């Protein structure tokens, strides 16, 4: 094992002594924790060596006690945990409930005690139902309130917000509901007054308004997502991967697999399942990402981030290959769009079909 047990001098043992004053009135017996974790910034100490060895496994990641059952790859940090786990394979239940009239059996003694204290140990059940002919007792007050629903048919936890008469069966559900009234205020920026009605709306707001923009180190264009930036950076490469359409009779090529998939779905398969729900629009798209990009058109706030310089009209050749020529060359270009297309198609290498869908080739842009 990577870590060894640290030496335990009398001073170290004294330092890890648990006293009655530290534990309060209900103090445990005084215990010397002689086995101390040697990992930096840990400070865990134990009174038995096997407990320390099991703890060290948390640092090293080791599980020295593997399950030997065929097909089971689980491992454990202590023999006790392995023994308890092995009972799930054998199905043995050697521990029987001690209460009269109860013959339930359990795989471990701890599970048997838990059952006994929950259902048979009346001494620790301090919350008793006083409805006629009931008398059931519970350890926790919220358990009693949940039980009383069977008598009153009224959920026990009522929303305290004025004008809201909703009720819930559990305090956790009431707490979650109260967020509807309080909301989720944005804490990313002191000047932001957004309050989300739900956690989902809050996360959506953070992603759209407070996400760090990814900046291209060549042209300084900004993008909301890093994958958009990666796609954009390919336009600056001299040698680029070209995706050729594998469909018979189609010589289209694209610089991203996304554009090729979009082309196949919308043009060849005529599938455009993503419809813009903005009133009066109704445009359809083959890819969800295309719809998300289009939605910026209808959102003035998003359009602010999409400001960019006007781009000159692209030739047919540049649209087919995805290549955008420099501005200086674009101005001085005297070759017609048809001639550019012919020269690029002639020099386009024949691709190899991959799984009948995508074809990749290298094309050097000069």
Curated annotation (Swiss-Prot):
Residues of the signal peptide: none
Zinc finger (C2H2-type): 35-59, 65-89, 95-120, 127-151, 157-181, 184-210, 214-236, 243-268, 274-298
Its biological purpose: Involved in ribosomal large subunit biogenesis. Acts both as a positive transcription factor for 5S RNA genes, and as a specific RNA binding protein that complexes with 5S RNA in oocytes to form the 7S ribonucleoprotein storage particle. May play an essential role in the developmental change in 5S RNA gene expression. Interacts with the internal control region (ICR) of approximately 50 bases within the 5S RNA genes, is required for correct transcription of these genes by RNA polymerase III. Also binds the transcribed 5S RNA's.
Record's protein name: Transcription factor IIIA
Entry's localization field: Nucleus
Amino acid composition bias (Basic and acidic residues), ranges on this chain: 299-310
UniProt modified residues of type Phosphoserine: 38, 336
Gene Ontology CC, one term: nucleus
Membrane-spanning parts: none
GO MF terms, alphabetically ordered: DNA binding; RNA binding; zinc ion binding
Main location: nucleus
One GO biological process term: ribosomal large subunit biogenesis
Effect of residue 42 to S: Loss of DNA binding
Gene3D superfamilies: Classic Zinc Finger
Keywords: DNA-binding, Metal-binding, Nucleus, Phosphoprotein, Repeat, Ribosome biogenesis, RNA-binding, Transcription, Transcription regulation, Zinc, Zinc-finger
PTM entry text: The N-terminus is blocked.
Tissue distribution of the protein: Synthesized in oocytes and, in much lower levels, in somatic cells.
Region (Disordered): 299-366
SUPFAM superfamilies: beta-beta-alpha zinc fingers
């Amino acid at each position: 094992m990577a870590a060894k047990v640290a030496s335990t001098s009398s001073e170290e043992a004294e330092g890890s002594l648990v006293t009655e004053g530290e534990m309060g009135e209900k103090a445990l017996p005084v215990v010397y924790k002689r086995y101390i974790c040697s990992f930096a910034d840990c400070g865990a100490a134990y009174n038995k060596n096997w407990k320390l060895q099991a703890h060290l496994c948390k640092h090293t990641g080791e599980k020295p006690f593997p399950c030997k059952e065929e097909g089971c790859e689980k491992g454990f940090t202590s023999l006790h945990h392995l023994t308890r786990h092995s009972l799930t394979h054998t199905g043995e239940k050697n521990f029987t409930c001690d209460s009269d009239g109860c013959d339930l059996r359990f795989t471990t003694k701890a599970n048997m005690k838990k059952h006994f204290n929950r259902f048979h140990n009346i001494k620790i059940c301090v919350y008793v139902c006083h409805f006629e002919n009931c008398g059931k007792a519970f350890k926790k007050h919220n358990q009693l309130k949940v039980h009383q629903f069977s008598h009153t048919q009224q959920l026990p936890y009522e929303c305290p917000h004025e004008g809201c008469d909703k009720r819930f069966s559990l305090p956790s559900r009431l707490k979650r509901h109260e967020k509807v009234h309080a909301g989720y205020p944005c804490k990313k920026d002191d000047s932001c007054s957004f309050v989300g009605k739900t956690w989902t709306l809050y996360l959506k707001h953070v992603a759209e308004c407070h996400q760090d923009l990814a900046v291209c180190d060549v042209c300084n264009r900004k993008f909301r997502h890093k994958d958009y930036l990666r796609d954009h950076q390919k336009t600056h490469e001299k040698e680029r991967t070209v995706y050729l359409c594998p469909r018979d009779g189609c010589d289209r090529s694209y610089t991203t697999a996304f554009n090729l998939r979009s082309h196949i779905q919308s043009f060849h398969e005529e599938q455009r399942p993503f419809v813009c729900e903005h009133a009066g629009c109704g445009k359809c798209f083959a890819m969800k990402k295309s719809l998300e990009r289009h939605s910026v058109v209808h959102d003035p706030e998003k359009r602010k981030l999409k400001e960019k310089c006007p781009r000159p009209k692209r030739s047919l050749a540049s649209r087919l290959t995805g290549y955008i020529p420099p501005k200086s060359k674009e101005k001085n270009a005297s070759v017609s769009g048809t001639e550019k297309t012919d020269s690029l198609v002639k020099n386009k290498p024949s691709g190899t079909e991959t799984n009948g869908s995508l074809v990749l080739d290298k094309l050097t842009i000069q």
